[in-house]
């Protein structure tokens, strides 16, 4: 009786889940247009699919108020057809461009009433990370040959402190699944979320200095499969921003108060934890601190 083929990983076969930032409020303030950015991204995806015929690419659009799957190479009937369709783009990305246009239009309609003009809002990173992990989990449970999965976040929108808990949950889930999260941040200010995601999961974080050469950055840094990364020199983080967001006002803080029961973080002292309901004994702490102050101030005889 023949042995049943066991599920195993392939060294040089990659499953790349790309999280594409489509926040229109961010792209209206950049030096590079979204169409130019998209041309770099599609050329990069074309290169990834060309490196190995078994490679898979999934693209998730990350909008302001929603996120959705817009491309899956495993479902494309003309996978491997790299001829141009007359628009300068490979023919395999025809469905991607169509679904992306529909998604952007729908996302703009949903976000009209929620947009504030005082700052650029964040994109729904927590939702797209969750969708990426769900897709990877489905791949793990189907088929006999699993490609090496990884997530690449292409983001320019600033971090949303209100998404802190959901984003961190996704990061630790990816760490448990041994799925690295690569990040390429093209915004003005660096992203603490993406820095922590790449650091915790063993991915690569990079901020391109020249967006005109984005394709070169993507191909030289992020096109490398996980097996080959041990033989190439990739950018290493100089410093990681580990600041957290408070649960009360949803803002990034350097120092704060932590509930010893549920580990919720607050920027100001509260008598009661709003998450688990634990009562903080600040009065005892005040008495202890005042007693220690009196001991320090006691005159020497």
Swiss-Prot record:
Pfam families: Tfb4. One of its GO terms (cellular component) is transcription factor TFIIH core complex. It comes from the Eukaryota. It is found in: Nucleus. Keywords: DNA damage, DNA repair, Metal-binding, Nucleus, Transcription, Transcription regulation, Zinc, Zinc-finger. GO terms for biological process: nucleotide-excision repair; regulation of DNA-templated transcription. Component of the general transcription and DNA repair factor IIH (TFIIH) core complex, which is involved in general and transcription-coupled nucleotide excision repair (NER) of damaged DNA and, when complexed to CAK, in RNA transcription by RNA polymerase II. In NER, TFIIH acts by opening DNA around the lesion to allow the excision of the damaged oligonucleotide and its replacement by a new DNA fragment. In transcription, TFIIH has an essential role in transcription initiation. PANTHER family: GENERAL TRANSCRIPTION FACTOR IIH SUBUNIT 3, TRANSCRIPTION INITIATION FACTOR IIH TFIIH , POLYPEPTIDE 3-RELATED. Component of the 7-subunit TFIIH core complex composed of XPB, XPD, TFB1/GTF2H1, GTF2H2/P44, TFB4/GTF2H3, TFB2/GTF2H4 and TFB5/GTF2H5, which is active in NER. The core complex associates with the 3-subunit CDK-activating kinase (CAK) module composed of CYCH1/cyclin H1, CDKD and MAT1/At4g30820 to form the 10-subunit holoenzyme (holo-TFIIH) active in transcription. This is General transcription and DNA repair factor IIH subunit TFB4.
